[in-house]
Amino acid sequence: MPVENEFPRELPNHSLISSKSQMTLQSIWLFRYPVSSIVCVQFPTDFPKPVLALSARIAIDLGLFTHIVQKCPITSRSLAAITGAEELLITRILRLLSTAHFAEETSTGTWAPTPITKTMAKEEIAAGYRFICHMVVPALQSAPGYFQHHGYSCPTDAKDGLVQHALQTKKTSFEYIMSDPHLLKDFNLFMGNGMGARKSWLDWYPVQSNILDGADADPDKALIVDVGGGKGHDLIAFHKRYPNAGRLVLEDLPAAFDDLGQYSMVIEKVPHDFLAEAQPVKGAKAYLCHHILHDWPDNYCVRILEGISSAMTPGYSKLLLHEGIVPEKGVCQFQAMSDIATMACNGGMERTREQWRTLLHMAGLQLIRFWNSPDEGGDGIIEAAKV
């Protein structure tokens, strides 16, 4: 039975937590909870949520989740000795966090891990919290002043949005991230966290019929170009399933690349700025953009799409946009919050089908089909071709 003021509308109980993988927890707690704690303060009972998110950030900075996992059970006194923080402060922070199952108080001042504790102890989750607190939270906090100053209109300039208003910079969010090595490291860890428990697009998109069949057998011709693909997670997953399919090209800014390890021989890295440069790889069978366009206002998206279109072969090349497809009515909470978060971060947007159609038309591309993920609220594939 939920206890009053324990936020049963938002916080899953232990039975639900136990039935989910840790990667699902990462989605629930890193995306849904911290963003909702800032965006969805609607009722007096929601007041503690920002305090909970702040307490989680302090616990991450002190390494409390890691110590609880590694040395359980552990007392506040022992945590104070390890971290150098005041014992009373640690107790007060963990006392609040335990009400939301971030840790379990087994006896007075003694703490043991829960499934959430173990998830929060992961470095990629800690990186995500730091990133959100550094950029997303200040941007959302600045929203009232920003919109008042800009006539209550959505941002259309990636150099003059909520992040810029909050952090007093004229850099795009990505330029700002690139300028700070610590923030860049956190961002890359966070973005490299994968799909969680959601199915990969390779599970439900018809790869064989739509990409492999009819592909040019010339080994110099690219099969897939992953535009802005970061660490190459999509291409690595593709290669594991289709090891002899063809040439795979990973494109991004040099700072975003990582060592591909054993896959460096099968995935070709090409430095590319999709906002400033024409697409260098011509005539690929498929150009993949995974969570790229939702980060940018329409005018930037058109520039990105036009750059890709210039390299596409009509009647052969496909454009695959792996993005959220927001319903016109009845949007789920995760998609709605993601829409506000992307707007805050870089003037981006989660788009409806009609908005995707319009965007493709503006770039001179033809919509072929929407492919829906089987996951509720999951991303889809917007498939397009060059007219």
Swiss-Prot record:
Keywords: Methyltransferase, S-adenosyl-L-methionine, Transferase. It is an enzyme of class 2 (transferase). One of its GO terms (molecular function) is O-methyltransferase activity. InterPro entries: COMT-like, O_MeTrfase_dom, SAM-dependent_MTases_sf, WH-like_DNA-bd_sf, WH_DNA-bd_sf. S-adenosyl-L-methionine binds at D252. GO terms for biological process: methylation; secondary metabolite biosynthetic process. Its EC number is 2.1.1.-. The active site is at H294 (proton acceptor). Pathway: Secondary metabolite biosynthesis; Alkaloid biosynthesis; Mycotoxin biosynthesis. Transmembrane segments: none annotated. It comes from the Eukaryota. Belongs to the class I-like SAM-binding methyltransferase superfamily. Cation-independent O-methyltransferase family. O-methyltransferase; part of the gene cluster that mediates the biosynthesis of the aspoquinolone mycotoxins. The role of asqD within the aspoquinolone pathway has still to be determined. The first step of the pathway is catalyzed by the nonribosomal peptide synthetase asqK that condenses anthranilic acid and O-methyl-L-tyrosine to produce 4'-methoxycyclopeptin. 4'-methoxycyclopeptin is then converted to 4'-methoxydehydrocyclopeptin by the ketoglutarate-dependent dioxygenase asqJ. AsqJ also converts its first product 4'-methoxydehydrocyclopeptin to 4'-methoxycyclopenin. This is O-methyltransferase asqD. The gene is asqD.
